[in-house]
Amino acid sequence: MTIVAEAVDLSHTYPGGVQALKNVNLSLSKGTRVAIVGQNGSGKTTLSKHFNGLLRPTTGKILINGIDAKNKTTGELAQSVGYVFQNPNYQLFSKTVREEIEFGLKNIGLQGEELRKRLIEALEIFDLKPLANKQPLSFSSGIRKIVALASVYAMHPPILFLDEPTTGQDHPGKEKIGQLLLTMANEGHTIVVITHDMNFVAKYVERVIVMAQGEIIKDGTPREIFSDYAVMEKAHIQPPQVFSLARSLASYGIQKDVLTPLEMAENILQRGLI
């Protein structure tokens, strides 16, 4: 697979001496869906913010398409790396949803028909057409996050980071975001989700990066990660409930590393347990 972004021997120390990252090495491949997980303070967000220039390495480097990002501005990096904050209030400031989406498009040089096409596409995909002329900050936190995601999506960044995208979302909202990420990855976008939502991880990502105390402690598939109790305990994360249930039902012939309720239902039916 083509590598589109790398962290090489990356360390970051905040003012005051707190070392948030310790010699992290990570490569991201084109068209993949990745989750970065770990407890608060493990370094997830600090690592992610290096890829779009919001933070700069204390030591080490970030490569975007093989090019050192140290001399790139955040504006230049934004054309390659989109970032949706955990708190959408940090990136919403326009008077209307329409203007919010247009702002990013104008920043990357779009105008005229292409800008209009991207705007309409984003409004339709995220069901925002009825809200296009309303003030983004007047919405619930869940809808504000959708607006922020739509504004970044409209720019079609090759790499997209989403910090806690399911926070404040109901089940249909989570499903919509998940399906969008699948579509974008199939189109060649690289998707990175920073999250505590292990059900979302189980259903929508293919690779999981586990962090603890500023280091990557494991890199694997969701099944591999959830099956490693030592890593889960060190990272202070819990597998999806259905995964734990499958473990307890293994003696009845249930596959012990079931990831989703649909997989569980299929296992039960295949074994004639109901």
Give the ranges of each region predicted by the language model.
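Conserved ABC transporter NBD signature motif
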Residues: 60-68, 77
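A short, flexible loop at the N-terminus of ABC-type nucleotide-binding domains that lies
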Residues: 1-7, 11-23, 71-73
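Conserved ABC ATPase "signature" region
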Residues: 113-131
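Conserved ABC ATPase "signature" C-loop
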Residues: 213-214
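The feature captures the beta-strand-to-loop junction immediately N-terminal to the Walker
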Residues: 37-39
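Helix-to-loop junction immediately C-terminal to a conserved catalytic motif
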Residues: 52
